Amino acid sequence: MERAEALTSSFIWRPNANANAEITPSCPRCGSSNTKFCYYNNYSLTQPRYFCKGCRRYWTKGGSLRNVPVGGGCRKSRRPKSSSGNNTKTSLTANSGNPGGGSPSIDLALVYANFLNPKPDESILQENCDLATTDFLVDNPTGTSMDPSWSMDINDGHHDHYINPVEHIVEECGYNGLPPFPGEELLSLDTNGVWSDALLIGHNHVDVGVTPVQAVHEPVVHFADESNDSTNLLFGSWSPFDFTADG
């Protein structure tokens, strides 16, 4: 009984398979019989859709043939092998960069230290350096440091320049080889070429704004008495410097 049922089922199945094989038509484009049924268009049993494996194109029974290029009806999404290879290399590189497989580790201690001790901005440091340089140039326009020894040399040279005009004027005040008057002994120089103490004391009392030429006064003759003779005029109270004017 069971065997008879099996034979009946197989007998029923085979005609259906043969019917499907007979229903599948050949390709209207290339005439190949290597075709297969795909689906019903718009779920309508009157519009079965087939696919030809020879020309790799679709068609619908009872419909018009469209000018579909060869292979245009294939629904397989083909991806180029080069892109897949590039994706594989990219994934391998990413995995080698992160051996742990997770996000990169962050040193919390370093982050906290940077938060407590922030680094100064480079632009602020450069601005401070420029301000310091500007202040230095304002204080010292020549841009050179004043060495004490160099400044002393300048003072010595200025002192010599200050004395030389006085010496030249005194030499011009000579009286053609005549012996000096008693007051002119103050103008004598010592063996080292330095003025006597009395002249230097008088020189110190000269104002800063007075030039060396103005500091030396012209000889002034003081007449003690109109009745005195010529000897009193020469050797009396005559002096090349008017010391009373300084007082």
Swiss-Prot record:
Residues 82-94 have a biased composition (Polar residues). A zinc finger (Dof-type) spans 25-79. Keywords: DNA-binding, Metal-binding, Nucleus, Transcription, Transcription regulation, Zinc, Zinc-finger. Zn(2+) binds at C27, C30, C52, C55. The gene is DOF3.5. This is Dof zinc finger protein DOF3.5. Residues 70-100 are annotated as: Disordered. It comes from Arabidopsis thaliana. GO terms for biological process: regulation of DNA-templated transcription. Transmembrane segments: none annotated. The keyword Signal does not apply.
